């Protein structure tokens, strides 16, 4: 600050203020002699990138050559290092940049061209940045599109895989359905000898189980299997026609599958079947039925059957049939039977039967046939279960469940409920159509009657399978210890699947002891009641179709079901029976000693089920012989 001068302001002294005012123009504009618009920094310095600095007004200049270039550069580096870019006034130091020193004396024309070039460069840079951003945005869009395309391709591949899986599942379901129609009983009975005690005694003529189920199949129509179980070829439809005793004409779909080296010739098997109606009566003790026995010189039983215990082996282009017999406790029963005459059916008619009710001229096709055919297959699966596959947790000596177990009986009756009910409805509908045709004097064709006879044969076959299972189960329970091993029931008593292995639960609580036994008794009683009611339906059809009494007919009691018993209630309608079947035998059949099959039955309490099997034997014989059954 300047020193005070005396003699002023009345006090003899005066002070001076510091001159801190800045110039109106910055140093760059001042040197270039252009109008400075003002501001810190000014627009011109901002565009040119020069440091804008305002000098103090009325400042004395320094002499030329006081500072050399090295000093200026050092000061410039010092000012840059200290960050002196605020533009504030520092009186002790005046810093100039290299650009300010270089442009200390610019020409007016050059400064204006620089001012015009800087905005153009800035605009170009902005355009370039925008173009780069657009390119990046386009690249991102392309990447997103590629990702979307990849996702769509993956979805299409997944859909194709799902469709392939669905097709594979459908094929498996179709194969399972076809395999389900072919029960394991076919392969079991055709590849293995008779292993159960049921049909092991079928060779003996004193057993109610002597008639083969194959004889019932012999009366079925040729096109029955194709009409009742889709038009596709199944293993069931391939085996059953081969077991028929008469040659048949296969459809084209079947012939194409049978024309190979190992084709089975049904005509060759038919030569092994013979029929005979000669029989002679024989008598037995009072505890059993007195039924006629066949003449061994004139009667020849078929050597194979579909559901019997026959052992059939196949070779290329030929078929050989042989029957293997085994010891059975059924042989001890001394229940004789009569020979069965097999009547081959006539060729099937080519006329199609309508599915809807016509104007009272043609009888519609029986609708209960598919259910009865499926029921026979299911019952045979229960009687002949497939052998279990040995796993790590099982022992090789473990045997499958017995075909005459309590579980199989109860499950078989449960499976038969719906088909039997459908058969009853079919009987009622057929009777109504017959009465309607009689009122309007219309004639029913033979095709409808054949379908009814086929359904009735399958119905009788299902009853016979269940009754024979019950009969064998009761016999098996009466045998213990050495008798079981002697008659090939198993190596130990544990092989018999008795009531102890059946689990009974109510509301999630398992029952045991006497309560469990009572519940099992009730279930078995109901099962036997349903089977007896089904047999009664068959006998009612046979009784209504009987003609006037002859020398070979007698009054037979109409059987009713009460508390699981097969009882006689009234003497009604004539029923043709053999001469040797006495009323005492029927009385024994209808006796009250019908205890349940739950382990306490004695050997002498088996006449009831055996008698029902005998009655069923003669009823099915009438079916095979072509007897007319009343469907009203």
Curated annotation (Swiss-Prot):
InterPro entries per UniProt: Zn2-C6_fun-type_DNA-bd_sf, Zn2Cys6_DnaBD
Swiss-Prot/TrEMBL induction comment: Expression is significantly up-regulated under xenovulene A producing condition.
Disruption phenotype: Does not affect the production of xenovulene A.
Cellular compartments annotated: Nucleus
Organism per entry: Sarocladium schorii
Biased composition (Polar residues): 101-111, 270-286, 294-306, 329-340
Lineage per the UniProt record: Eukaryota, Fungi, Dikarya, Ascomycota, Pezizomycotina
Coiled coil: none
Pfam families referenced in this protein's UniProt entry, alphabetically: Zn_clus
Record key words, sorted: DNA-binding, Metal-binding, Nucleus, Transcription, Transcription regulation
Name of the protein in question: Transcription factor asR4
Purpose of the protein: Transcription factor; part of the gene cluster that mediates the biosynthesis of xenovulene A, an unusual meroterpenoid that has potent inhibitory effects on the human gamma-aminobutyrate A (GABAA) benzodiazepine receptor.
UniProt-recorded Gene Ontology molecular function terms: DNA binding; DNA-binding transcription factor activity, RNA polymerase II-specific; zinc ion binding
Matches recorded under Gene3D superfamilies: Zn(2)-C6 fungal-type DNA-binding domain
DNA-binding region: 26-52
Record has Aminoacyl-tRNA synthetase as a keyword: no
Membrane-crossing segments per the record: none
Gene Ontology cellular component list: nucleus
UniProt biased composition (Low complexity): 112-129
Region (Disordered): 101-129, 270-311, 324-356
Superkingdom of the source species: Eukaryota
Known uses: Xenovulene A is a natural product exhibiting little structural resemblance with classical benzodiazepines yet is able to displace high-affinity ligand binding to the benzodiazepine site of the gamma-aminobutyrate A (GABAA) receptor and could be potentially used as an anti-depressant with reduced addictive properties.
């Amino acid at each position: 600050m300047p020193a005070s001068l005396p003699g002023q302001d009345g006090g003899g002294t005066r002070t001076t203020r510091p001159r801190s005012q800045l110039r109106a123009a910055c140093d760059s504009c001042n040197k270039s002699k252009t109008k400075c618009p003002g501001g810190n920094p000014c627009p011109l310095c901002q565009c040119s990138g020069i440091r804008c600095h305002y000098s103090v007004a009325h400042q004395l200049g320094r002499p030329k050559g006081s500072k050399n270039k090295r000093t200026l550069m050092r000061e410039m580096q010092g000012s840059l290092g200290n960050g002196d870019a605020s533009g504030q006034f520092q009186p002790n130091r005046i810093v100039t940049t290299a650009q300010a020193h270089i442009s200390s004396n610019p020409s007016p024309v050059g400064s204006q061209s620089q001012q015009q070039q800087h905005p153009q460069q800035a605009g170009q840079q902005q355009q370039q940045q925008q173009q780069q951003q657009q390119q990046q945005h386009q690249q991102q869009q392309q990447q997103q599109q590629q990702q979307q395309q990849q996702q769509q391709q993956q979805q299409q591949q997944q859909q194709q895989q799902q469709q392939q899986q669905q097709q594979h599942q459908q094929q498996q379901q179709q194969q399972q359905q076809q395999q389900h129609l072919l029960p394991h009983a076919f392969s079991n009975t055709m590849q293995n000898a008779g292993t159960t005690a049921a049909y092991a005694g079928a060779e003996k003529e004193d057993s109610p189980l002597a008639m083969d189920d194959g004889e019932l199949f012999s009366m079925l129509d040729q096109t029955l299997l194709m009409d009742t179980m889709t038009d596709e070829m199944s293993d069931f439809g391939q085996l059953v026609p081969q077991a028929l005793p008469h040659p048949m004409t296969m459809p084209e779909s079947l012939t194409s599958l049978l024309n190979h080296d190992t084709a089975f010739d049904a005509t060759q098997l038919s030569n092994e079947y013979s029929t005979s109606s000669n029989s002679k009566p024989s008598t037995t003790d009072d505890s059993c039925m007195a039924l006629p026995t066949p003449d061994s010189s004139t009667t020849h039983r078929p050597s194979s059957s579909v559901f019997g215990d026959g052992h059939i082996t196949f070779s290329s282009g030929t078929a050989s049939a042989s029957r293997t017999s085994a010891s059975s406790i059924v042989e001890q029963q001394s229940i004789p039977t009569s020979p069965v005459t097999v009547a081959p059916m006539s060729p099937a008619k080519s006329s199609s039967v309508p599915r809807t009710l016509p104007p009272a001229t043609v009888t519609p096709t029986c609708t209960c046939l598919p259910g009865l055919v499926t029921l026979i297959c299911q019952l045979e699966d229960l009687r002949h279960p497939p052998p279990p596959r040995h796993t790590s947790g099982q022992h090789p000596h473990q045997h499958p469940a017995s075909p005459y177990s309590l579980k199989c009986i109860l499950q078989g009756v449960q499976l038969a409920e719906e088909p039997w009910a459908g058969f009853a409805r079919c009987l009622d509908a057929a009777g109504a159509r017959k009465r309607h045709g009689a009122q309007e004097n219309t004639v029913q064709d033979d095709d409808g009657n054949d379908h009814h006879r086929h359904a009735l044969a399958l119905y009788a076959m299902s009853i016979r399978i269940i009754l024979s299972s019950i009969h064998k189960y009761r016999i098996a329970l009466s045998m213990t210890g050495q008798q079981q091993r002697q008659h090939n029931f198993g190596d130990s008593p544990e092989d018999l699947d008795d009531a102890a292995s059946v689990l009974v639960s109510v509301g999630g609580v398992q029952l045991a002891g006497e309560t469990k036994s009572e519940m099992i008794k009730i279930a078995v009683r109901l099962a036997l009641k349903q089977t007896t009611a089904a047999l009664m339906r068959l006998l009612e059809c046979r009784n209504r179709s009987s003609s006037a009494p002859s020398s070979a007919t007698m009054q037979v009691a109409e059987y009713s079901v009460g508390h699981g018993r097969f009882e006689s209630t009234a003497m009604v309608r004539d029923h043709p029976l053999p001469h040797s079947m006495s009323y005492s035998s029927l009385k024994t059949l209808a006796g009250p000693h019908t205890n349940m099959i739950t382990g306490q039955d004695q050997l002498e309490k088996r006449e009831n089920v055996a008698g029902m099997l005998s009655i069923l034997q003669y009823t099915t014989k009438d079916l095979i012989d072509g007897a007319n059954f009343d469907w009203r």
